[in-house]
Protein backbone atom coordinates (compact mmCIF):
# COMPACT_ATOMS: atom_id res chain seq x y z
CA UNK A 1 0.00 0.00 0.00
CA UNK A 2 1.48 3.34 -0.95
CA UNK A 3 -1.29 5.95 -0.67
CA UNK A 4 -3.74 7.10 1.98
CA UNK A 5 -6.54 9.58 1.51
CA UNK A 6 -7.31 12.03 4.33
CA UNK A 7 -11.07 12.26 3.91
CA UNK A 8 -12.81 15.64 3.90
CA UNK A 9 -15.24 14.52 6.59
CA UNK A 10 -12.45 13.96 9.09
CA UNK A 11 -9.63 16.15 10.40
CA UNK A 12 -6.27 17.49 9.29
CA UNK A 13 -3.80 15.08 10.84
CA UNK A 14 -0.98 16.23 13.11
CA UNK A 15 2.59 16.74 11.94
CA UNK A 16 3.77 13.36 13.19
CA UNK A 17 1.37 11.57 10.86
CA UNK A 18 2.82 13.29 7.79
CA UNK A 19 6.37 12.72 9.05
CA UNK A 20 5.62 9.00 9.21
CA UNK A 21 4.21 9.07 5.68
CA UNK A 22 7.36 10.87 4.48
CA UNK A 23 9.57 8.31 6.17
CA UNK A 24 7.72 5.26 4.85
CA UNK A 25 7.01 6.46 1.33
CA UNK A 26 3.24 6.71 1.72
CA UNK A 27 1.67 9.28 -0.58
CA UNK A 28 -1.15 11.39 0.86
CA UNK A 29 -4.27 12.47 -1.02
CA UNK A 30 -5.21 15.44 1.17
CA UNK A 31 -8.82 16.57 1.17
CA UNK A 32 -9.67 19.97 2.55
CA UNK A 33 -12.19 19.48 5.35
CA UNK A 34 -15.42 19.66 3.38
CA UNK A 35 -17.70 16.70 2.67
CA UNK A 36 -21.21 15.82 1.53
CA UNK A 37 -22.83 19.22 2.16
CA UNK A 38 -23.22 22.65 0.58
CA UNK A 39 -21.48 25.51 2.38
CA UNK A 40 -22.17 29.25 2.85
CA UNK A 41 -20.60 31.88 0.62
CA UNK A 42 -20.76 35.05 2.70
CA UNK A 43 -17.54 37.10 3.04
CA UNK A 44 -17.01 36.22 6.70
CA UNK A 45 -17.25 32.48 6.00
CA UNK A 46 -15.00 32.70 2.95
CA UNK A 47 -12.35 34.53 4.98
CA UNK A 48 -12.58 31.83 7.66
CA UNK A 49 -12.12 29.13 5.01
CA UNK A 50 -9.18 31.00 3.50
CA UNK A 51 -7.34 31.35 6.79
CA UNK A 52 -7.88 27.68 7.68
CA UNK A 53 -6.63 26.64 4.24
CA UNK A 54 -3.59 28.93 4.37
CA UNK A 55 -2.69 27.68 7.84
CA UNK A 56 -2.79 24.01 6.81
CA UNK A 57 -1.17 24.46 3.40
CA UNK A 58 1.78 26.32 4.93
CA UNK A 59 2.04 23.67 7.66
CA UNK A 60 1.97 20.73 5.27
CA UNK A 61 3.37 21.98 1.95
CA UNK A 62 6.97 20.87 2.57
CA UNK A 63 6.03 17.27 3.25
CA UNK A 64 7.04 15.20 0.21
CA UNK A 65 4.20 12.77 0.97
CA UNK A 66 1.56 15.28 -0.17
CA UNK A 67 0.61 14.07 -3.65
CA UNK A 68 -2.65 15.96 -4.21
CA UNK A 69 -4.84 18.60 -2.60
CA UNK A 70 -8.55 17.93 -3.10
CA UNK A 71 -11.22 20.53 -2.42
CA UNK A 72 -13.93 18.28 -1.02
CA UNK A 73 -15.52 14.86 -0.88
CA UNK A 74 -18.50 14.16 -3.17
CA UNK A 75 -20.08 17.62 -3.12
CA UNK A 76 -19.91 18.04 -6.90
CA UNK A 77 -21.48 14.62 -7.40
CA UNK A 78 -24.08 15.23 -4.70
CA UNK A 79 -25.22 18.60 -6.04
CA UNK A 80 -25.51 17.11 -9.49
CA UNK A 81 -27.27 13.84 -8.73
CA UNK A 82 -28.39 13.32 -5.13
CA UNK A 83 -31.64 15.28 -5.42
CA UNK A 84 -30.57 18.21 -3.25
CA UNK A 85 -31.66 20.82 -5.81
CA UNK A 86 -35.32 19.82 -5.47
CA UNK A 87 -35.45 21.59 -2.09
CA UNK A 88 -34.59 25.00 -3.58
CA UNK A 89 -35.91 27.52 -6.08
CA UNK A 90 -33.86 28.29 -9.18
CA UNK A 91 -32.64 31.53 -7.60
CA UNK A 92 -31.60 29.72 -4.42
CA UNK A 93 -29.82 27.04 -6.43
CA UNK A 94 -27.81 29.67 -8.27
CA UNK A 95 -26.79 31.38 -5.03
CA UNK A 96 -25.80 28.07 -3.39
CA UNK A 97 -23.79 26.95 -6.42
CA UNK A 98 -22.00 30.31 -6.64
CA UNK A 99 -20.91 29.85 -3.02
CA UNK A 100 -19.68 26.39 -3.97
CA UNK A 101 -17.64 27.63 -6.93
CA UNK A 102 -16.27 30.53 -4.88
CA UNK A 103 -14.79 28.09 -2.37
CA UNK A 104 -13.69 25.15 -4.51
CA UNK A 105 -12.98 26.67 -7.93
CA UNK A 106 -11.60 30.05 -6.86
CA UNK A 107 -10.52 30.41 -3.23
CA UNK A 108 -8.82 27.05 -2.56
CA UNK A 109 -6.95 26.83 -5.89
CA UNK A 110 -5.73 30.40 -5.34
CA UNK A 111 -4.35 29.35 -1.94
CA UNK A 112 -2.58 26.37 -3.51
CA UNK A 113 -1.15 28.52 -6.29
CA UNK A 114 0.11 31.21 -3.90
CA UNK A 115 1.49 29.09 -1.09
CA UNK A 116 2.91 26.01 -2.87
CA UNK A 117 5.39 25.41 -5.65
CA UNK A 118 2.91 24.11 -8.20
CA UNK A 119 1.15 21.44 -6.12
CA UNK A 120 -1.73 19.70 -7.89
CA UNK A 121 -5.30 20.64 -6.93
CA UNK A 122 -8.50 18.69 -7.68
CA UNK A 123 -11.77 20.55 -6.91
CA UNK A 124 -13.89 17.60 -5.72
CA UNK A 125 -13.79 13.83 -5.60
CA UNK A 126 -15.09 12.32 -7.80
CA UNK A 127 -14.79 14.44 -10.95
CA UNK A 128 -13.87 13.78 -14.57
CA UNK A 129 -11.76 16.94 -14.81
CA UNK A 130 -10.78 20.10 -12.92
CA UNK A 131 -13.25 22.54 -14.49
CA UNK A 132 -16.75 23.53 -13.39
CA UNK A 133 -19.13 20.99 -14.93
CA UNK A 134 -16.56 18.19 -15.20
CA UNK A 135 -18.78 15.81 -13.26
CA UNK A 136 -17.96 12.16 -12.65
CA UNK A 137 -18.80 10.07 -15.71
CA UNK A 138 -19.58 6.41 -16.37
CA UNK A 139 -17.72 4.65 -17.79
CA UNK A 140 -15.02 6.51 -15.91
CA UNK A 141 -12.49 6.98 -18.70
CA UNK A 142 -10.98 10.11 -17.14
CA UNK A 143 -10.67 11.71 -13.74
CA UNK A 144 -11.46 9.74 -10.60
CA UNK A 145 -14.56 7.85 -9.55
CA UNK A 146 -16.26 6.38 -6.50
CA UNK A 147 -17.57 2.93 -7.36
CA UNK A 148 -20.46 1.89 -5.11
CA UNK A 149 -22.19 -0.50 -7.48
CA UNK A 150 -20.98 -3.17 -5.09
CA UNK A 151 -22.86 -2.31 -1.89
CA UNK A 152 -25.35 0.46 -2.71
CA UNK A 153 -26.51 -0.89 -6.07
CA UNK A 154 -26.19 -4.56 -5.09
CA UNK A 155 -23.80 -5.46 -7.89
CA UNK A 156 -22.14 -8.84 -7.46
CA UNK A 157 -18.41 -8.83 -6.74
CA UNK A 158 -17.82 -10.05 -10.28
CA UNK A 159 -19.06 -6.65 -11.52
CA UNK A 160 -15.78 -5.04 -10.47
CA UNK A 161 -14.42 -6.40 -13.76
CA UNK A 162 -16.98 -4.35 -15.73
CA UNK A 163 -16.55 -1.09 -13.80
CA UNK A 164 -12.94 -0.04 -14.20
CA UNK A 165 -11.96 3.61 -13.79
CA UNK A 166 -8.72 5.47 -14.31
CA UNK A 167 -8.43 6.10 -10.56
CA UNK A 168 -10.97 4.58 -8.17
CA UNK A 169 -10.63 6.93 -5.22
CA UNK A 170 -13.36 5.26 -3.15
CA UNK A 171 -14.87 1.78 -2.97
CA UNK A 172 -15.60 -0.53 -0.08
CA UNK A 173 -17.74 -3.03 1.78
CA UNK A 174 -18.97 -3.28 5.37
CA UNK A 175 -18.23 -5.80 8.11
CA UNK A 176 -18.67 -6.12 11.85
CA UNK A 177 -15.76 -5.86 14.26
CA UNK A 178 -14.43 -9.09 15.69
CA UNK A 179 -16.20 -10.64 18.68
CA UNK A 180 -13.57 -9.41 21.17
CA UNK A 181 -14.25 -5.82 20.09
CA UNK A 182 -18.03 -6.27 20.18
CA UNK A 183 -17.77 -7.60 23.73
CA UNK A 184 -16.48 -4.17 24.80
CA UNK A 185 -19.91 -2.57 24.22
CA UNK A 186 -22.39 -5.44 24.62
CA UNK A 187 -23.76 -7.91 27.14
CA UNK A 188 -24.66 -11.53 26.28
CA UNK A 189 -28.31 -10.56 25.85
CA UNK A 190 -27.21 -8.20 23.05
CA UNK A 191 -25.66 -10.98 20.95
CA UNK A 192 -27.87 -10.48 17.90
CA UNK A 193 -26.92 -8.14 15.06
CA UNK A 194 -30.46 -6.69 15.20
CA UNK A 195 -30.40 -6.05 18.96
CA UNK A 196 -30.80 -2.47 20.19
CA UNK A 197 -27.14 -2.13 21.15
CA UNK A 198 -25.81 -3.68 17.93
CA UNK A 199 -28.17 -1.49 15.90
CA UNK A 200 -26.89 1.59 17.72
CA UNK A 201 -23.41 0.58 16.56
CA UNK A 202 -24.52 0.20 12.93
CA UNK A 203 -25.00 3.64 11.43
CA UNK A 204 -25.82 2.52 7.90
CA UNK A 205 -29.56 2.16 7.44
CA UNK A 206 -29.00 -0.68 4.97
CA UNK A 207 -25.87 -2.13 6.61
CA UNK A 208 -27.16 -5.34 8.17
CA UNK A 209 -29.46 -5.98 5.22
CA UNK A 210 -26.61 -5.65 2.71
CA UNK A 211 -24.31 -7.91 4.71
CA UNK A 212 -26.99 -10.61 4.92
CA UNK A 213 -27.88 -10.27 1.22
CA UNK A 214 -24.31 -10.55 -0.01
CA UNK A 215 -23.48 -13.32 2.44
CA UNK A 216 -26.41 -15.33 1.14
CA UNK A 217 -25.10 -14.97 -2.40
CA UNK A 218 -21.64 -16.30 -1.56
CA UNK A 219 -21.72 -18.18 1.76
CA UNK A 220 -23.98 -20.11 4.09
CA UNK A 221 -25.42 -17.56 6.52
CA UNK A 222 -24.61 -18.69 10.09
CA UNK A 223 -27.04 -18.49 12.98
CA UNK A 224 -24.34 -18.22 15.67
CA UNK A 225 -23.60 -14.59 16.60
CA UNK A 226 -19.83 -14.93 16.87
CA UNK A 227 -19.66 -16.82 13.59
CA UNK A 228 -21.79 -14.14 11.94
CA UNK A 229 -19.34 -11.42 12.97
CA UNK A 230 -16.45 -13.51 11.66
CA UNK A 231 -18.19 -14.37 8.39
CA UNK A 232 -18.95 -10.69 7.72
CA UNK A 233 -15.20 -10.09 7.76
CA UNK A 234 -14.55 -13.03 5.45
CA UNK A 235 -17.16 -11.58 3.07
CA UNK A 236 -15.60 -8.10 3.19
CA UNK A 237 -12.14 -9.56 2.56
CA UNK A 238 -13.42 -11.41 -0.50
CA UNK A 239 -14.90 -8.20 -1.92
CA UNK A 240 -11.81 -6.09 -1.33
CA UNK A 241 -9.38 -8.72 -2.63
CA UNK A 242 -11.39 -9.16 -5.84
CA UNK A 243 -11.61 -5.38 -6.28
CA UNK A 244 -7.91 -4.74 -5.74
CA UNK A 245 -6.73 -7.60 -7.93
CA UNK A 246 -9.13 -6.52 -10.68
CA UNK A 247 -8.02 -2.90 -10.57
CA UNK A 248 -4.36 -3.91 -10.65
CA UNK A 249 -4.90 -6.30 -13.56
CA UNK A 250 -6.13 -3.33 -15.58
CA UNK A 251 -2.99 -1.22 -15.24
CA UNK A 252 -1.98 1.08 -16.91
CA UNK A 253 -5.60 2.06 -17.71
CA UNK A 254 -6.39 1.95 -13.99
CA UNK A 255 -3.58 3.33 -11.84
CA UNK A 256 -5.24 3.95 -8.49
CA UNK A 257 -7.51 2.11 -6.05
CA UNK A 258 -8.34 3.53 -2.61
CA UNK A 259 -10.43 1.49 -0.18
CA UNK A 260 -13.07 3.15 1.97
CA UNK A 261 -11.99 2.94 4.74
CA UNK A 262 -8.91 2.21 6.82
CA UNK A 263 -9.96 2.92 10.41
CA UNK A 264 -12.82 3.72 12.80
CA UNK A 265 -13.35 6.62 15.22
CA UNK A 266 -15.49 4.43 17.51
CA UNK A 267 -16.23 0.68 17.85
CA UNK A 268 -18.86 0.06 15.19
CA UNK A 269 -19.94 -1.95 12.16
CA UNK A 270 -18.41 -0.10 9.22
CA UNK A 271 -16.42 -0.24 6.00
CA UNK A 272 -13.12 -0.13 7.91
CA UNK A 273 -10.39 -2.72 7.48
CA UNK A 274 -9.04 -2.15 11.00
CA UNK A 275 -11.37 -1.64 13.94
CA UNK A 276 -11.40 1.02 16.67
CA UNK A 277 -8.94 -0.95 18.79
CA UNK A 278 -6.59 -1.33 15.79
CA UNK A 279 -7.36 -5.01 15.34
CA UNK A 280 -6.87 -6.07 11.74
CA UNK A 281 -9.99 -7.36 10.06
CA UNK A 282 -9.75 -10.14 7.49
CA UNK A 283 -9.82 -7.51 4.72
CA UNK A 284 -6.66 -5.83 5.99
CA UNK A 285 -4.73 -9.10 5.75
CA UNK A 286 -6.22 -9.73 2.29
CA UNK A 287 -5.36 -6.24 1.07
CA UNK A 288 -1.80 -6.54 2.33
CA UNK A 289 -1.42 -9.56 0.06
CA UNK A 290 -3.28 -7.96 -2.87
CA UNK A 291 -1.11 -4.82 -2.68
CA UNK A 292 2.30 -6.51 -2.75
CA UNK A 293 4.62 -5.19 -5.50
CA UNK A 294 4.26 -8.46 -7.43
CA UNK A 295 1.09 -10.54 -7.29
CA UNK A 296 -0.69 -13.35 -9.02
CA UNK A 297 -4.14 -12.15 -10.04
CA UNK A 298 -6.04 -15.15 -11.47
CA UNK A 299 -9.08 -14.43 -13.62
CA UNK A 300 -11.75 -17.14 -13.49
CA UNK A 301 -14.58 -17.19 -16.03
CA UNK A 302 -17.30 -19.74 -16.74
CA UNK A 303 -15.02 -21.80 -18.97
CA UNK A 304 -11.41 -20.70 -18.42
CA UNK A 305 -8.76 -19.80 -15.87
CA UNK A 306 -6.30 -17.13 -16.95
CA UNK A 307 -3.19 -16.45 -14.87
CA UNK A 308 -2.12 -12.82 -14.65
CA UNK A 309 0.99 -11.43 -13.01
CA UNK A 310 1.10 -7.79 -11.90
CA UNK A 311 4.58 -6.31 -11.53
CA UNK A 312 4.84 -2.87 -9.90
CA UNK A 313 8.62 -3.08 -9.67
CA UNK A 314 10.82 -0.80 -11.82
CA UNK A 315 12.62 -3.89 -13.13
CA UNK A 316 11.41 -6.82 -15.27
CA UNK A 317 10.65 -10.15 -13.65
CA UNK A 318 11.14 -13.69 -14.96
CA UNK A 319 10.65 -17.08 -13.41
CA UNK A 320 8.47 -20.17 -13.38
CA UNK A 321 4.88 -20.93 -12.47
CA UNK A 322 3.26 -24.10 -11.19
CA UNK A 323 -0.46 -24.86 -11.36
CA UNK A 324 -1.54 -27.81 -9.22
CA UNK A 325 -5.05 -29.26 -9.31
CA UNK A 326 -5.86 -30.79 -5.93
CA UNK A 327 -8.72 -32.33 -4.04
CA UNK A 328 -9.69 -30.82 -0.71
CA UNK A 329 -8.02 -33.83 0.94
CA UNK A 330 -4.70 -32.76 -0.56
CA UNK A 331 -4.61 -35.38 -3.31
CA UNK A 332 -2.76 -34.11 -6.38
CA UNK A 333 -4.70 -34.66 -9.63
CA UNK A 334 -2.43 -32.91 -12.12
CA UNK A 335 0.40 -30.38 -12.41
CA UNK A 336 1.11 -27.81 -15.10
CA UNK A 337 4.32 -25.78 -15.26
CA UNK A 338 5.77 -23.04 -17.39
CA UNK A 339 7.92 -19.95 -17.57
CA UNK A 340 6.90 -16.32 -17.44
CA UNK A 341 8.41 -12.93 -18.24
CA UNK A 342 6.88 -9.65 -17.12
CA UNK A 343 8.13 -6.18 -17.98
CA UNK A 344 8.64 -3.49 -15.36
CA UNK A 345 5.38 -1.83 -14.32
CA UNK A 346 3.25 -4.26 -16.28
CA UNK A 347 0.23 -6.50 -15.79
CA UNK A 348 0.01 -9.36 -18.26
CA UNK A 349 -1.42 -12.88 -18.62
CA UNK A 350 1.15 -15.67 -18.46
CA UNK A 351 -1.04 -18.74 -19.09
CA UNK A 352 -4.62 -19.84 -19.71
CA UNK A 353 -6.41 -23.17 -19.31
CA UNK A 354 -9.91 -24.45 -19.90
CA UNK A 355 -11.90 -25.36 -16.80
CA UNK A 356 -12.84 -28.68 -18.39
CA UNK A 357 -9.19 -29.54 -18.93
CA UNK A 358 -8.29 -28.64 -15.36
CA UNK A 359 -11.14 -30.49 -13.68
CA UNK A 360 -11.33 -33.50 -16.00
CA UNK A 361 -13.48 -36.02 -14.07
CA UNK A 362 -13.17 -34.27 -10.70
CA UNK A 363 -16.06 -32.42 -9.08
CA UNK A 364 -15.87 -28.63 -9.23
CA UNK A 365 -17.26 -28.59 -5.69
CA UNK A 366 -14.27 -30.34 -4.12
CA UNK A 367 -11.38 -29.44 -6.41
CA UNK A 368 -9.08 -26.43 -6.30
CA UNK A 369 -6.12 -24.93 -8.12
CA UNK A 370 -2.98 -23.98 -6.19
CA UNK A 371 -0.91 -21.59 -8.30
CA UNK A 372 2.63 -20.54 -7.42
CA UNK A 373 5.01 -18.16 -9.17
CA UNK A 374 8.71 -18.30 -8.39
CA UNK A 375 11.82 -16.32 -9.17
CA UNK A 376 14.54 -18.91 -8.96
CA UNK A 377 13.73 -20.89 -5.82
CA UNK A 378 11.98 -17.98 -4.13
CA UNK A 379 8.18 -18.07 -3.95
CA UNK A 380 6.96 -14.68 -5.19
CA UNK A 381 3.24 -15.32 -4.70
CA UNK A 382 0.77 -18.15 -4.26
CA UNK A 383 -2.98 -18.15 -4.86
CA UNK A 384 -5.79 -20.63 -4.42
CA UNK A 385 -8.62 -20.73 -6.95
CA UNK A 386 -11.93 -22.50 -6.35
CA UNK A 387 -14.25 -23.60 -9.13
CA UNK A 388 -17.51 -23.01 -7.23
CA UNK A 389 -18.90 -20.37 -4.91
CA UNK A 390 -17.89 -20.85 -1.26
CA UNK A 391 -21.42 -21.88 -0.28
CA UNK A 392 -21.32 -24.65 -2.91
CA UNK A 393 -17.98 -26.14 -1.86
CA UNK A 394 -18.09 -29.52 -0.10
CA UNK A 395 -16.17 -28.46 2.99
CA UNK A 396 -15.98 -31.29 5.49
CA UNK A 397 -14.85 -31.01 9.10
CA UNK A 398 -11.07 -30.47 9.18
CA UNK A 399 -8.73 -31.76 11.87
CA UNK A 400 -6.64 -28.67 12.60
CA UNK A 401 -3.55 -29.29 14.72
CA UNK A 402 -1.89 -26.32 16.44
CA UNK A 403 1.61 -26.10 17.86
CA UNK A 404 2.99 -23.14 19.80
CA UNK A 405 6.73 -22.51 19.92
CA UNK A 406 9.01 -19.84 21.34
CA UNK A 407 12.13 -18.72 19.50
CA UNK A 408 14.41 -15.91 20.67
CA UNK A 409 11.67 -14.45 22.82
CA UNK A 410 9.04 -14.54 20.07
CA UNK A 411 6.02 -16.83 20.06
CA UNK A 412 4.87 -18.65 16.94
CA UNK A 413 1.84 -20.68 15.93
CA UNK A 414 2.15 -23.48 13.40
CA UNK A 415 -1.05 -25.10 12.13
CA UNK A 416 -1.65 -28.13 9.94
CA UNK A 417 -4.81 -29.76 8.65
CA UNK A 418 -5.89 -33.05 7.13
CA UNK A 419 -8.21 -31.34 4.63
CA UNK A 420 -9.03 -27.89 3.33
CA UNK A 421 -10.12 -25.31 5.91
CA UNK A 422 -11.01 -21.90 4.48
CA UNK A 423 -10.25 -18.47 5.96
CA UNK A 424 -9.06 -19.84 9.30
CA UNK A 425 -9.01 -17.17 12.01
CA UNK A 426 -6.89 -17.79 15.09
CA UNK A 427 -7.69 -15.86 18.25
CA UNK A 428 -7.28 -15.79 22.02
CA UNK A 429 -10.65 -15.21 23.74
CA UNK A 430 -10.60 -12.17 26.00
CA UNK A 431 -6.92 -11.47 25.33
CA UNK A 432 -5.34 -8.69 23.31
CA UNK A 433 -3.12 -10.38 20.74
CA UNK A 434 -1.64 -9.52 17.36
CA UNK A 435 -1.28 -12.24 14.74
CA UNK A 436 1.15 -11.20 12.01
CA UNK A 437 -0.84 -13.35 9.58
CA UNK A 438 -4.37 -14.68 9.86
CA UNK A 439 -7.57 -15.61 7.98
CA UNK A 440 -5.74 -18.01 5.67
CA UNK A 441 -6.83 -21.16 3.85
CA UNK A 442 -5.14 -24.21 5.38
CA UNK A 443 -4.23 -27.03 2.99
CA UNK A 444 -2.89 -30.52 3.69
CA UNK A 445 0.86 -30.50 3.21
CA UNK A 446 1.15 -26.71 3.60
CA UNK A 447 1.86 -25.80 7.26
CA UNK A 448 0.74 -22.30 8.24
CA UNK A 449 2.97 -20.24 10.53
CA UNK A 450 2.39 -16.88 12.18
CA UNK A 451 3.90 -14.88 15.01
CA UNK A 452 1.67 -14.12 18.02
CA UNK A 453 2.40 -10.92 19.92
CA UNK A 454 0.88 -11.18 23.36
CA UNK A 455 2.03 -11.02 26.99
CA UNK A 456 0.73 -14.57 27.51
CA UNK A 457 3.26 -17.33 28.03
CA UNK A 458 3.68 -20.21 25.59
CA UNK A 459 1.79 -22.49 27.96
CA UNK A 460 -1.07 -20.01 28.38
CA UNK A 461 -1.40 -19.65 24.61
CA UNK A 462 -1.53 -23.43 24.21
CA UNK A 463 -4.41 -23.59 26.67
CA UNK A 464 -6.40 -20.67 25.28
CA UNK A 465 -5.84 -20.59 21.51
CA UNK A 466 -8.99 -21.02 19.41
CA UNK A 467 -9.88 -20.84 15.72
CA UNK A 468 -12.84 -20.30 13.42
CA UNK A 469 -13.23 -21.35 9.79
CA UNK A 470 -15.84 -21.13 7.06
CA UNK A 471 -18.59 -23.64 7.68
CA UNK A 472 -17.70 -24.29 11.31
PLM ranges: what are they?
Residues 1-37, 45-68, 199, 204-237:
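Active-site-adjacent substrate/metal-binding segments within catalytic domains
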Residues 23, 39-132, 238, 277-278:
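Active-site neighborhood of glycoside hydrolase catalytic domains
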Residues 69, 76, 103, 110-113, ...:
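Substrate-binding clefts and catalytic carboxylate motifs of secreted carbohydrate-active enzymes
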Residues 303-306, 409-413:
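Structural beta-strand segments of beta-rich domains
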Residues 309-313, 414-419:
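Asparagine-centered strand-capping/turn motif at beta-strand->loop junctions
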Residues 317-322, 422-428:
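Short, hydrophobic/aromatic beta-strand segments
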Residues 324-363, 431-458:
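Intrinsically disordered, low-complexity Pro/Gly/Ser/Thr-rich segments with frequent PxxP/GP/PP motifs
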Residues 349, 354-398, 455-472:
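Terminal connector regions
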